[in-house]
Amino acid sequence: MKLADKKADRGFVAKGDEINYAKRSNDELIDLLKSRIAIERTIGARLLGSRGVVSVEYLLMALKTEKKLYPRLEICCSLARIGEPSIDGLIQLLGVIGNNQHQTPSEEPFLKVSYPLPRDLAARTIIRIGHAALPVLCGVLNEDHPAKISEAIDAIGFICSKGGADQYLKTLMACYNKFKNNDLLRWKLFRAMSSFTESLTFLEKHLSVENNPAILQEIKRSIRIINKNKR
């Protein structure tokens, strides 16, 4: 199979190729989103991004079941483009889609200075909406659903790494106190604290008591990033 055919099979549509469908009604675009043809699903998802809140429910349903790369990417782009009306639905999908999420602390060091992109698809979409999602994400940390909390922490850490959200450190601290015996959440929380200069003392305190090598490595990384950002 030629490269172009492979991309078409995965639903690739070049920018601008959707123009012939632009005047279709919302219902017609929703039907495209349900098509058996991946290219049509991509077109439907792309155009629904400009139709606002009425599209959110259908895009979220499609995101749960879509297996092809390009329609899935376009669904995420449209949900992010619609913005705040997408947040609550995406929150419900944290930790639900796919199996790419971390299940244990990674022993592979993350060497970049930038905050790592979430591996969870819903979290990765939420971070594109930005600071508006933080209050709802922090609400997740009060739940008793570790898999969902795990992905919310990634999104909070990423968004807060861009600055202007120092008030959310207290929420992360409270989450730490609640889940400090959960290795995965502890690892992710120490990573998220790299986004907050005020967490330095807390991180340094745990540097001497943490005994999990992967988590200890993450504490050191967060301390290093904070000290670099303070210069």
Regions found by a protein language model. Give the residues of each.
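Structural detector for internal amphipathic alpha-helices that build alpha-solenoid repeat scaffolds
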Residues: 1-21, 38-53, 61-62, 70-85, ...
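Amphipathic alpha-helical scaffolding segments comprising HEAT/armadillo-like alpha-solenoid repeats
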Residues: 20-34, 52-65, 84-106, 131-142, ...
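Acidic interaction surfaces
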Residues: 212-213
